[in-house]
Swiss-Prot record:
Residues 275-451 form the Helicase C-terminal domain. This is ATP-dependent RNA helicase DBP5. ATP-dependent RNA helicase associated with the nuclear pore complex and essential for mRNA export from the nucleus. May participate in a terminal step of mRNA export through the removal of proteins that accompany mRNA through the nucleopore complex. May also be involved in early transcription. PANTHER family: ATP-DEPENDENT RNA HELICASE DBP3. Keywords: ATP-binding, Cytoplasm, Helicase, Hydrolase, Membrane, mRNA transport, Nuclear pore complex, Nucleotide-binding, Nucleus, Protein transport, RNA-binding, Translocation, Transport. It comes from the Eukaryota. It catalyses: ATP + H2O = ADP + phosphate + H(+). Residues 97-264 form the Helicase ATP-binding domain. The keyword Phosphoprotein does not apply. Associates with the nuclear pore complex. The Q motif is unique to and characteristic of the DEAD box family of RNA helicases and controls ATP binding and hydrolysis. The gene is DBP5. GO terms for cellular component: cellular bud tip; cytoplasmic stress granule; nuclear membrane; nuclear pore cytoplasmic filaments; nucleus. It comes from Mycosarcoma maydis.
Length: 456
C-alpha cells in the first residue's frame, strides 16, 4: 500500500503562528518567491456566494496572508516550504470560503498554475482529525499522472504533520486491502472499486474533491465513477469541484451535485494562453507531417517538448520510428504498464528526457515547468468528432506554464484538419500564424526566434 506517515500533528491554530511564519518568510529570497511560479491573472476573481445576503467583497471572504486563515503552525511551515509567500489571487478568495465553518461546497474555475491544487490540499489537511486513523479526505483526478502530482503537493505541504496518505491507483493498492490513510488521492475507477470492496470506509470523509471536474464529468465513464464515489459520502461532506473550464452542461451538472455551493470563476477570456506564440504548419499529407516533425527535432530539444497525438498507436509508431532513426524520444499513453507510465513521466519531469510523445493523458493539469514547445501532431477532437477548443487550451497550456512564455505548433494536412484548427482559433479568439514547411532554414529561424523570446 502506498501509505506514508510524517512527524508531528497539526490539529488547530497556535499562538506563535505569526512568529514562526515571519521567521520562515524572512528566509525566502526574491528568487524563492519567483520560483513558486504562480500565474497572476490581470482580472479580479469573481465570487458568487451561496448566501445571497452576504457581501463577497467583505474582508471576511479574502485573505491577504496565510497567517490570517488561522492555520496550524505545522501547515504554515509546509506552505512556506513550498515557497509560497502569500496567497495567489485564487487562494486569497477561495481559502476563506473553503475553510469556513460549517463547511460549504465550492465550484471553482481556475487555470492551472494559479495555486488551486494547494488550495484544496490545504482544505483537506485542515479538516482532518489527526487522532482518527480513518479516511477523512479524498481527491479524485482523471489520470494516474495527475493523481501522483497532486499527492506530491500533499506530501510536501503536510511534511511537518503526521498525516497518513494513500495513492489509490492500479498497482498501488489491491482490491479488498484495508486503507486507513487519512488523506487519499486516486482515480475514479480504482477508488470506487476500493469502496465497493470495503477497502475504503467513507463514513468519516469530511472533504471530497474532484479536480479537472469538466474532464471527469464530461467523460461518461469517469463521470459515472466519480458520482458513484460521491454518492457513498456522508451528507455532511464538503464537496469541492475545481477545473480550468466549465462548459455549460458540466456547470449545470456541477450545480446539481454540489447544491448551495460558493462559486469562484475567472472570465472565459481569462482562461487564455497569452504568453504562448501559436503557429501552424501546412503539411502535404500524413507522411509529410512525420518528415516535418523529424526536421524540427533539434528545436524540440532546446528545452523540453510534448507532441500530442490523437491515438496511442500513432504515439507509439512515431516514437518507434524516431528512435530507430537515432532520435531520443519517449511515448506515454494509458495502455502502457503502470510502472512504465510512472518511469516515463518521472524522467520527463526530472529533465532526464527531452521529448515526450503523448495522447491526452497529460493534456490536463500536469506541471512540467521546463516545457517550452508543444506540437499538436493531430488536432484535438471531442468524443463526437468535433474540434475540441478546451482540450487544445489544456494541451498548449503545458508550455508557457504559470504565466511564462512558450511556443505551440499545429500540424494540418487536409481540409478537415484545417477546419478543426480554424474552429479552435475562432472559439478561443486567438491568432495562429502560418510557418512555411518548404524552406527548412526559414522554418527553423521562425521557431528559434519565438523560442528565444521565452527567456525575455
Amino acid at each position: 500500500m502506498s501509505e506514508s506517515k510524517d512527524k508531528t500533528t497539526a490539529p488547530a491554530a497556535d499562538s506563535n503562528v505569526n512568529e514562526i511564519a515571519s521567521g520562515i518568510s524572512g528566509l525566502l529570497s526574491s528568487k524563492d518567491v519567483a520560483e513558486s511560479n504562480l500565474r497572476e491573472s490581470s482580472h479580479e476573481v469573481q465570487v458568487t456566494l451561496a448566501d445571497q445576503q452576504a457581501d463577497p467583497n467583505s474582508p471576511l471572504y479574502s485573505a491577504k496572508s496565510f497567517e490570517a486563515l488561522g492555520l496550524h503552525e505545522n501547515l504554515l511551515k509546509g506552505i512556506y516550504a513550498m515557497k509560497y509567500q502569500k496567497p495567489s489571487k485564487i487562494q486569497e478568495k477561495a481559502l476563506p470560503l473553503l475553510l469556513q465553518n460549517p463547511p460549504k461546497n465550492m465550484i471553482g474555475q481556475s487555470q492551472s498554475g494559479t495555486g488551486k491544487t494547494a488550495a484544496f490540499i490545504l482544505t483537506m489537511l485542515s479538516r482532518i482529525d489527526y487522532d482518527l486513523q480513518k479516511p477523512q479526505a479524498i481527491a479524485l483526478a482523471p489520470s494516474r499522472e495527475l493523481a501522483r502530482q497532486i499527492m506530491d503537493v500533499a506530501r510536501t505541504m503536510s511534511k511537518f504533520t503526521n498525516v497518513t496518505t494513500c495513492l489509490c491507483l492500479p498497482d498501488e493498492v489491491k482490491r479488498g486491502e484495508k486503507i486507513t490513510a487519512q488523506l487519499i488521492i486516486g482515480t475514479p475507477g480504482k477508488t470506487f472499486d476500493m469502496i465497493k470492496s470495503k477497502g475504503i470506509d467513507t463514513a468519516a470523509i469530511k472533504v471530497f474533491v474532484l479536480d479537472e471536474a469538466d474532464n471527469m464529468l464530461d467523460q461518461q465513464s469517469l463521470g459515472e465513477q466519480s458520482i458513484r464515489v460521491k454518492n457513498t459520502m456522508p451528507k455532511s461532506c464538503q464537496l469541492v469541484l475545481f477545473s480550468a473550464t466549465f462548459p455549460t452542461n458540466v456547470y449545470d451538472f456541477a450545480v446539481r451535485i454540489a447544491p448551495g455551493a460558493n462559486e469562484i470563476r475567472l472570465k472565459q477570456e481569462e482562461l487564455s494562453v497569452e504568453g504562448i506564440k501559436q503557429f501552424y504548419m501546412d503539411c502535404k499529407d500524413e507522411d509529410h507531417k512525420y518528415e516535418v516533425l523529424v526536421e524540427l527535432y533539434n528545436l524540440l530539444t532546446i528545452g523540453q517538448s510534448i507532441i500530442f497525438c490523437a491515438k496511442r498507436e500513432t504515439a507509439d509508431r512515431i516514437a518507434q520510428k524516431m528512435t530507430q532513426e537515432g532520435h531520443k524520444v519517449d511515448s506515454l499513453h494509458g495502455r502502457l504498464e503502470t510502472a512504465d507510465r510512472d518511469r516515463t513521466i518521472d524522467a520527463f519531469r526530472d529533465g532526464k528526457s527531452k521529448v515526450l510523445i503523448s495522447t491526452n493523458v497529460i493534456a490536463r493539469g500536469i506541471d512540467i515547468q521546463q516545457v517550452t514547445l508543444v506540437i499538436n501532431y493531430d488536432m484535438p477532437l471531442t468524443q463526437t468528432g468535433e474540434a475540441d477548443a478546451e482540450t487544445y487550451l489544456h494541451r498548449i497550456g503545458r508550455t508557457g506554464r504559470f504565466g511564462r512564455k512558450g511556443v505551440s505548433i499545429n500540424f494540418v494536412h487536409d481540409q478537415q484538419s484545417w477546419s478543426y484548427m480554424d474552429q479552435i482559433e475562432k472559439a478561443l479568439k486567438c491568432q495562429i500564424t502560418r510557418v512555411a514547411t518548404n524552406d527548412l532554414e526559414e522554418m527553423e529561424y521562425t521557431i528559434k526566434e519565438a523560442l528565444k523570446q521565452i527567456g525575455k
